[in-house]
Amino acid sequence: MPSIILPPKPTALQKPHLNLAVIGHVDNGKSTLVGRLLYETGYVDEKAFKEIEEMAKKMGKEDFAFAWILDRFKEERERGVTIEATHVGFETNKLFITIIDLPGHRDFIKNMIVGASQADAALFVISARPGEFETAIGPQGQGREHLFLIRTLGVQQIVVAVNKMDIVNYDQKRYEQIKAEVSKLLKLLGYDPSKIHFIPVSAIKGDNVKTKSSNTPWYNGPTLLEALDTFQPPPRPVDKPLRMPIQDVFTITGAGTVVVGRVETGVLKVGDRVVIVPPAKVGDVRSIETHHMKLEQAQPGDNIGVNVRGISKEDVRRGDVLGKVDNVPTVAEEIVARVVILWHPTAIGPGYAPVMHIHTATVPVQIVELVSKLDPRTGQAVEQKPQFIKQGDVAIVKIKPLKPVVAEKFSEFPALGRFALRDMGRTIAAGQIIEVKPAQVQIK
């Protein structure tokens, strides 16, 4: 049976590549909208989709067909049909867009942090349905939390899809109300809402996704695909040392160990001698593959599977980082970071021990010192060595990882220098690393 989602067409690989995080509160229609985008751009296998549609009809759940594209794909992925199938992509006129970390995992926020740290842009999906919108951007809403996260993780470009317009009868007033409230939130986060497209869509019916809808005569902006086409692919740092955080590791019969990840900086070539840290294991690159195509070399932004000789699957795990032996990624003994406290019920002092999510790694850490508290607007220190910090504060802190992890200065390697701290099932803080005290690493 063919995979439900088709691999990139030859035309796609000629286009600049952009990684897109799809964010928003649960049940606001992220999966349906992603399914619709893939379908409208010709990236869904017709035959497999017909089966899904018929099944949905039989069960009286026609509205679920587009969301089920991703469910079917996830099942294929769990059965191990392909090695780098964690990503799906589609084309606009100018770009090839990879959707990172598909929505719908229970662990979504955790995966979303990993995903957002690799994102060049974000699609924020918000439901127009009464109650759903209010919950999503309320104080406990994931929609609000996701926006805070991508802001802190450095995602500058956003498009907003106001979804489920069919449920509110394409009411312009409701659209304007949502646009105004989301704009307020975006402004608070330092975005300029006048530069952000808000598109009234229905993922289920297809309004304004690929073609202009007659149901919204009052709307004269771009369609969703046109809006996504306005994203600027970021410059790719090819001249920096190689860094590739590992997302997954497999053993493939007849091939050996394959590590999967996205090249953040530098260039990786077949034949390179590489090192994976923290385990400090050395190996040689046998082959590189992306979306079922063999590559001689991979550049920043490429999501790849790398076949490494000399390293066994047991030696490597998600969160390790691949680099070259002549410039080994930094394993951190201690870091100094600027953090913003997004949520905490009381106050945070030295000794506080949350979990850090940094690139693809998750490690327990301890805050060992509060260095200073900053004015969020100017970045100037307003208090040295505060006793505690609380929700809304911005501070410089010293953090000690309780297990080995790779961390770099944000100014040198942005994707390995930004992180989130989580505790109690919530994102407590997000931060950027200013300094790293390196740990001793013995290359094996």
Swiss-Prot record:
| Annotated EC | 3.6.5.3
- UniProt keyword annotations, A-Z: Cytoplasm, Elongation factor, GTP-binding, Hydrolase, Magnesium, Metal-binding, Nucleotide-binding, Protein biosynthesis
Q: Does the keyword Transcription apply?
A: no
One GO cellular-component annotation of the UniProt record comes to: cytoplasm
User: Which EC main class describes this enzyme?
Assistant: hydrolase
G2: region residues: 80-84
The record's GO molecular-function terms, alphabetically, read: GTP binding; GTPase activity; translation elongation factor activity
What's the protein called, per UniProt? Elongation factor 1-alpha
- Source gene? tuf
